[in-house]
Curated annotation (Swiss-Prot):
Gene name of the encoded protein: efp
Pfam families registered for this protein in UniProt: EFP (PF01132), EFP_N (PF08207), Elong-fact-P_C (PF09285)
UniProt main location, coarse: cytoplasm
MF GO annotations: translation elongation factor activity
Pathway(s) this gene product operates in, as recorded in its UniProt entry: Protein biosynthesis; polypeptide chain elongation
CDD domains: S1_EF-P_repeat_1, S1_EF-P_repeat_2
Protein name per the record: Elongation factor P
Length: 187
């Protein structure tokens, strides 16, 4: 579907220069001299490169509609991650580098959303939060709690994050999967 350059909003996926790009930030600019334009920060969905582009109001771009399907994570096989379509029960195999650092947060039976373009996977979204157990946490040094400080900890999946001083090994905590940061203790 074609849209004008001034209608591009953050989150829109467009076809530009032969690739698929997601709009990260947009800024409508109305200079004193010349026509208005939309300054858009784009991120390539395939390789992650960023690009700043100006779109005049009169320009048209192709807005791409991505299909989103729910898949269940089944298991890890070497460098591949195996998922199952929740509706058709077909299996989908993705490489670990496709998921990136967040692959460590995948748990058996976890539901993820895979974005498809012409039946080809181009993106994956994990749940925003996961609950994990702290495997190792450094002890708190007395007198170090006067200022807000964090200490390093290792989670059960091997990921290192910073946690507040009161968190100790064996506790379950909630972690943000996008920022890979501590959120709170688990209930």
């Amino acid at each position: 579907m074609k849209i004008n350059g001034n209608e591009i909003r953050p989150g829109n996926v467009i076809e530009h220069n032969g690739g698929l790009w997601v709009a990260v930030k947009t800024n409508a600019v109305k200079p004193g001299k010349g026509g208005a334009y939309n300054q858009v920060e784009l991120k390539n969905l395939i390789d992650g490169t960023k690009l700043n582009e100006r779109f005049r109001s009169a320009e048209t771009v192709e807005k791409v509609r991505l299909e989103q399907k729910d898949f269940t994570f089944l298991y890890e096989q070497g460098d591949a991650l195996v998922f199952m379509d929740s509706e058709t029960y077909e299996q989908l195999e993705l490489q670990k580098d496709f998921v990136g650092d967040r692959a460590a947060f995948l748990q058996d039976g976890m539901t993820v959303t895979v974005e498809l373009y012409q039946e080809k996977p181009i993106g994956i979204s994990l749940p925003p939060q996961v609950t994990l157990q702290v495997a190792e946490a450094d002890p708190v040094v007395k007198g170090q709690t006067a200022a807000s400080s964090y200490k390093p900890a290792v989670l059960e999946n091997g990921v290192r994050i910073l946690v507040p001083p009161f968190v100790s090994a064996g506790e379950r905590i909630v972690v943000d999967t996008d920022e890979i940061t501590y959120l709170r203790r688990a209930d």
